[in-house]
Amino acid sequence: MSEIFLQVIESLTINIELLLQDLDFTTNKTNLLELDQLIICHSLLGLSRQEIADKLKLKSMTIRDRLSNNIYPKIAEIMGVEQKDIAGNWVKILNFLLNPQNGYKLNPAPQLNSDNFQASFGRQFFLYPPNQDIVKLQTEATKFYQLGLYYQALKYFSMAWNQEIKLYDVGNPESLIYINNSLIEYHKSLFQANQIRVYTIAVVVPFYHNSGKVAAEILRGISQIQLQVNWLTFNKFNLDKTIDLNSIKPKIFSTLISSPILLKILIVNDPNNLYTPYNQTAEKLAALFQELSLIAIIGHYSSEMTKNAFRFYADKGLVLVNACSTSNELTDLSLMSFFRLTTPDNTNAQRLADFLMSHIAEREQSKIALIYNHNSIYCQSYRNSMKKYLEAYQDKLIFLEECGYINESYYRVQKYIENIQRAGVDMIIIIPDGGLEPNSLNNAGLISRLNLNNCLIAGSATFYQENILHWVHEQNQYRDINQDHLQIIACIPWHWHSQENGCNSENIIAQYFCKLGSQLWGEGNLNWRSATAFDAVLVVLKVIEKYHSETSQALLEDMDRYFKEQRRFIKGVTGNIQFKATGDRLNPPTEIVAVKWHSQQQKWQWTI
């Protein structure tokens, strides 16, 4: 795109490419010359005929002739007026082009970023692949989105999506969200004319945690439900006939809601910083909610950030639906505007404790150690819950000295590991924080220094990471690990092979979740964070479907009425979803999973 075109787009928010294209298709069959295009652009930017002549080093008469003989007749035709009515009157022409009803006025995406806030409908990427060709496509896509050129943005987002599928067999959920957002913006007038309502949800994820892996897992669930909801409308208006959407078209379609609506997603980066005095991300997002027409917030990831952020949303009448934070402290957060899809620490700890005690039932006594981050309210919550349930079995357990500093130096944690090894530890419960301090998860890798065949390692849901599989694989290269008796487990809310809610269960929503997930991300690449994120959006959509909520305040009241007063439930990927008055789930799901060797795929996997 030429520099002068960009000037017109950025200064005037006019789709100059569309205008020039339409001018070439008037009854005056003479196509515009490059000179004509330059004259039009400079005229729109306010230059006089003489100034244009001087700039292009031409005679003023030449500019006059091109305007009179070729440019004005074409412009007059698309405006539906006589040439004499607009000749020389660029203010009138400009007013025509800036009238949204005439189709040339661009609607650029809002600039949201500042020093303490990063958010995107498509203006920027957070998840970049190693391949630089794909990065270039992503960069071009965001440039077009910034300018409000949504068709071009859509094409480049789609090319980036296709290239990642081709190279890695896994799509980028951020690209899929931006494809959906671009389609909504590009066809906005069509949807408005047909009274299709667009709902905007903000999703707050920690891109800095674990190299963006957790954010990607959450966004897979978000982008998948966005596509599933939007495709009903895209298909109704045959949008795939005008632009190639085969790469994202669901091969098997399942309807989640009966009435066609559209879902637009704002992706927000949460720095996830434990030592920030208050949540600036939440404060800024709450301040923007009216400007952005936000209906609800999905987030945050860590319990600490969720607790700090909640008051900003509550003060604005915004519903906060949480998919990943498990601390018991969140139970008393709100009686109205908070809903939690994942399983609280108290429930997880009880399930894990029961499993551990059944595992050692035949032993006289077992030595147990707890490793966690004492700075984290989540880790403290989980640790306290585990201690409460395990102390009921004091005659069967010997509690070794605890390690509350998994977040500190590698060498200090290593020394602790060596000490409990010498003490003959039988079980370790490891509770990394939710990415608040990077050493926490990195130090969890020290488990590979233990004799894994003789010690049971039990982790919380934050321990459920691909990193653990990589560490086991690396350790397997240096010493022989018994592939049948490796003892690493975790307690999580959902798994791909869950008997009740997995890919082969009787839960139809979970079945389709896995089938579409296989198409978009490859088999088995949806995990508990993806599933609870999907369900977090689903509870919002089900209430919108029933009450046709128009505003965030109306949605808050409708969700409170439906789930907390009437005690209604819906079916989601993670099973029946019903809430207590506190916003916690009734009978939340738990699954015990273990690291096992997959002989066919020749790799370690988390499995039931």
Go through each PLM region and give its residues.
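Extracytosolic ligand-binding ectodomains
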Residues: Q111-I608
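An N-terminal, helix-rich hydrophobic module
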Residues: S2-N107
